[in-house]
Amino acid sequence: IAPERPGADAVLRFCQEHQIQTAVGHSAATFEEIKKMRAYGLGGFTHTFSGMKGFHHRELGTAGAALYFDDMICEFAKQTVSHEAFELAYRIKGSSRIVLTTDCCGLAQTQSCFDHYVRKIRFVKDRDQVCLEHYDGKKEWIDPRDYQAVKQVEMSYAQSVKNMPDHTKVGLYDIMLMTSFNPAHYIHADDCKGSIRPGMDADLTIMDQNLDLICVYCRGKEIRE
């Protein structure tokens, strides 16, 4: 939500009363506006730094608020920020206040027309391929089954996580926190998700030492394509 928009406080109150977790999204909110809205259950920042009012030493803005408030989570779609920007947040927030997310939305699998106005590309299904129609008139086609081609369109969550040790100082344990326990705790689901112990749902992602995916289990059962 953009907390500076008219009616945002009413929406936040409703969500708080119904135990719905809310977060700041693309927003031009000032530091004081976010400080005020925290009383209504505003708990974090989605896609931290992306489309947010920037930091200034006299007006911390949305980005500054994300770093300042210890009790608010910073969600990162890691592929959308520089390594240094993430490193700065990591030093300030620590591993317990960061959640790794993704903005991968399956563009290569679109079944209709998806207009990506930020990238100025339309993704159009063309039989068994996807046509990328650029606003400048250029067209290119990709095969959704071609993994290397799809990687050029958007980075998967798994690949984004895999890149972490190569480009940041974040260790494997902290990566596991940011991708499992922290998100479960953030949405109040850590009583059954986010860790491995008796009584949990046994939702497991098995990876090798290179962080390549081996298999996935949902409630103790292996998921196969």
Where are the regions that the model predicts?
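Active-site core of metal-dependent hydrolases
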Residues: 1-112
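Conserved acidic residues
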Residues: 43, 203, 214
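His/Asp/Glu-enriched, well-ordered alpha-helical/loop segment
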Residues: 61-74, 91-102, 108-198, 204
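Short, surface-exposed secondary-structure boundary micro-motifs
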Residues: 207-210
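Short glycine-/small-residue-rich flexible loop motifs, especially phosphate/cofactor-binding loops
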Residues: 12, 34, 161-162, 181, ...
